[in-house]
A protein has these predicted regions:
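Generic short beta-strand
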Residues: 32-34, 41, 47-48, 71, ...
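Bacterial N-terminal signal peptides that target proteins for export
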Residues: 1-7
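Extended, loop-rich substrate-binding clefts of extracytoplasmic carbohydrate-active enzymes
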Residues: 52-98
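Catalytic and substrate-binding regions of extracellular carbohydrate-active enzymes
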Residues: 40-68, 665-676, 682-684
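Bacterial N-terminal signal peptides
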Residues: 8-16
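Sec/Tat signal peptide C-region and signal peptidase I cleavage site
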Residues: 17-21
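Catalytic-domain carbohydrate-binding cleft regions of carbohydrate-active enzymes
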Residues: 23-42, 74-76, 87-90, 98-647, ...
């Protein structure tokens, strides 16, 4: 049922002098969906201004008739058109100027109540250098109140959207790609301040009595989200670098035909009974130093018999995914520079990581770069990890890209263009049977890819940040997300942190298992080097994740059709309950599962709020049922993820206790790599002799 909306443009003038340019005004939006402040269900927009090189100019709005919805006023020598247009239960608010060539910024403020809650904007917990989001002792979580956020994509936890929702029943999306700034009641406790660069200013203000409706509406407007193939929801394995070694981790000579570390992983996982449907190969995989990314060619010394290896993995129901980046190396770099295919404003000559990036606004440059991607797709590669795009990218100076926009405007626009360019060529070769996974995102990215949480810290606070990031990403319209299990930066490989992270990862749409130091849980650079506990936990949760493939796929379809993410912060499912806004470490996973990951070392209990309207069965103790609408303390050993099934749901997670006992027993026995390697060698020799086989 559509909510009747009343639009009232209220004149609130504060006369500092007789000059019209110094008058202040406000726009008042009235909606039954808004929670009342002092008895009024209104949203007040004031402090409207624009800036030029000569400074700030306040905007007066006079006699704006609601039936017309717009008015022209003069301020600072400019004709300013202010427009407010109701759209069903929402509003579009726009500011335009004539002339606009000297306009550098626009701004406004929205009134805030003392306890109002805000979330969205970015996956990182707090703005600034990414390590602040996993600093020891960090207290900030989902709520952005009290934070200032620069809306410019920062490396390397880099999923952003200029969209936030409020607990008062509204949400704001700033359209466009220009950098901006949000101030959530920091400089003024009674206001949210929004400022964005650019010649015009365009906002959509959503209203709904249900926060989930705000999330759904924005996700569809900004998407709809990409629908991955079902196999994307299988467990993954990856390493940061692959070397070709003469022996396996235990000293067994390598006789098999492919990269030794890939063979080791595949053979060991098979022996342990750890399911794996995707093997992602990070850089370097090509010739050239230091990146191993020259000309989209495969380094046959590092990855011998690559095309045959892809077929071997395919026969094992394992897809091959490669790392890529939006720059040129090798012979392509010289040709791209000669033809003017690279971004203006980059430092030359090339130094550090400042490799020539493709100008994705130039069709010829894009096609030239896409030809490299096509070479890999022809080899059977089924997807790509899209790194970079937000790091070492020019953003200041008088430079313009091919289509005429400034490099400043190009800054946030680049990641969506990057993923779209890869999507176009992958779609041509593979139809719908592929996925892409960038680390950087902005509005416009979601129709083309799934996402991962960047180079997160490998500490307990890094796990904490990931629990927040997956929920923030869901709110922003990025439903399919995963993190580097055990972390990437500052990786300590602590047993308890890795174990808890494996458990958390199983209840993510993407479960991608490193760890990053080019090792596995059977040859760690600390004691125990062969960590049977982590191998057992990996097996337990990889098998659980495998059982959830159909469940994950079902909710990915729902996200694409309706905008509702599978990861649901509790305020999306039980917004009337105060604990749903404060118990940030617990989320609903689809309709039928509730998960409460533990991130702190030494912790063996968890406070869990159970959403009202249902009762919840303990996945570890099926006789234990918790009534919704209450908070309970639950026990959880180091291998146990607090996990609950909605009573009446048809979801089979298996016998987790039995699975754990089996996993411990299996992990305690080291596989015979000599026998496994010999089996693979026989298969290869038979295949080479023309005998076929898989």
């Amino acid at each position: 049922m559509k909510t009747k909306l009343l639009l009232c443009i209220a004149l609130m003038l504060v006369l500092n002098s007789v000059s019209l340019a110094q008058q202040r005004s406000s726009i008042t939006l009235q909606s039954a969906n808004l929670k009342p402040i002092a008895g009024s269900r209104t949203l007040t927009i004031d402090n409207m201004f624009f800036e030029t090189a000569n400074g700030r100019v306040d905007i007066p709005v006079l006699n704006l008739d609601a039936s017309v919805g717009s008015i022209d006023v003069t301020a600072g020598g400019h004709k300013i058109t202010v427009s407010v247009k109701p759209q069903a239960r929402d509003f579009n608010v726009t500011f335009k100027a004539q002339p606009d060539s000297d306009i550098t910024k626009w701004g406004l403020a929205i009134n805030s109540s003392p306890t109002e809650y805000y979330t969205g904007l970015m996956e990182r917990v707090v703005d600034g250098p990414q390590a602040k989001s996993w600093a020891t002792g960090i207290q900030e979580a989902m709520n952005l109140r009290g934070q200032k956020v620069d809306m410019i994509i920062k490396p390397t936890t880099s999923i952003y959207a200029p969209y936030y929702l409020s607990s008062r029943g509204y949400a704001v999306l700033v359209n466009g790609n220009w950098p901006g700034y949000f101030d959530f009641a920091v400089s003024d406790p009674g206001r949210v301040k929004i400022e964005f660069e650019g010649p015009s200013f365009d906002l959509k203000i959503y209203t709904a009595s249900d926060p989930a409706a705000l999330v759904r509406a924005h996700a569809i407007d900004a998407g709809p989200p990409f629908m991955p193939p079902k196999w994307m929801f299988t467990p993954w394995r990856w390493r940061d670098e692959h070397t070709q070694r003469p022996t396996y981790y235990d000293g067994t000579p390598v006789t098999g035909p492919f990269n030794s570390e890939i063979m080791e992983d595949v053979l060991m996982m098979k022996a342990f009974g750890i399911p794996n449907g995707i093997y992602w190969i990070d850089r370097p995989w090509g010739p050239g130093k230091p990146w191993g990314y020259d000309d989209f060619d495969i380094d046959e010394q590092r990855l011998p018999n690559f095309a045959e290896m892809v077929k071997w993995l395919d026969a094992k129901q394992t897809k091959t995914v490669l790392w890529i980046a939006p720059f040129f190396q090798g012979k392509m770099m010289k040709e791209a520079l000669d033809k003017g295919y690279t971004l203006a404003g980059q430092v030359r000559p090339v130094s550090g990581n400042n490799y020539p990036m493709v100008d994705l606004t130039n069709p010829a440059a894009t096609a030239y770069w896409q030809d490299g991607i096509a070479k890999l797709l022809k080899l059977g590669v089924a997807g790509f990890k899209l790194d970079r795009a937000e790091e070492d990218i020019p953003e200041t100076g008088p430079y313009k890209v091919f289509d005429g926009r400034t490099i400043r405007e190009n800054r946030n626009a680049y990641p969506p263009m990057y993923v779209k360019a890869v999507y176009e060529v992958a779609k041509k070769f593979r139809g719908n049977d592929f996925f892409l996974m960038p680390r950087a995102a902005y509005t416009g990215s979601s129709p083309y890819s799934v996402f991962w949480g960047g180079d997160i810290g490998g500490t307990q606070e890094g796990l904490r940040a990931s629990i927040i990031a997956i929920q923030r990403s869901a709110v922003m319209g990025y439903p399919n997300w995963g993190s580097d299990i055990c972390g990437y930066n500052q990786q300590l490989l602590e047993q308890e942190v890795c174990g808890r992270w494996l458990a958390f990862g199983a209840l993510n749409p993407i479960m991608e298992v490193g760890p990053t130091r080019n090792v596995a849980f059977w040859n760690l650079p600390r004691e125990p080097t062969y960590d049977s506990q982590l191998i057992a936990i990996w097996r337990l949760y990889a098998r659980l994740h495998e059982r959830l493939i159909d469940y994950n796929y079902q909710y990915a379809q729902e996200a694409t059709k309706t905008g509702m993410p599978i990861v649901r912060p509790l305020f999306l499912v039980d917004p009337a309950a105060p604990p749903a806004w404060s118990n940030w470490w617990t989320y609903q996973y689809g309709r039928d599962l509730l998960v409460s990951p533990i991130w702190e070392k030494g912790k063996r209990t968890q406070e869990v709020y159970f959403p009202a309207g249902s009762s919840w069965r303990d996945a570890w103790n099926p006789k234990k049922i918790y009534r919704g609408g209450q908070t309970f303390t639950v026990n959880a050993d180091t291998y146990q993820l607090p996990l609950f099934i909605r009573v009446g749901a048809k979801v089979d997670l298996g016998d987790l206790n039995k699975e754990w006992k089996e996993s411990v027993e299996i992990a305690g026995k080291k596989p015979d790599l000599k026998a496994l390697d010999a089996e693979l060698k026989r298969w290869w020799d038979t295949r080479r002799a023309g005998g076929g086989g898989q």
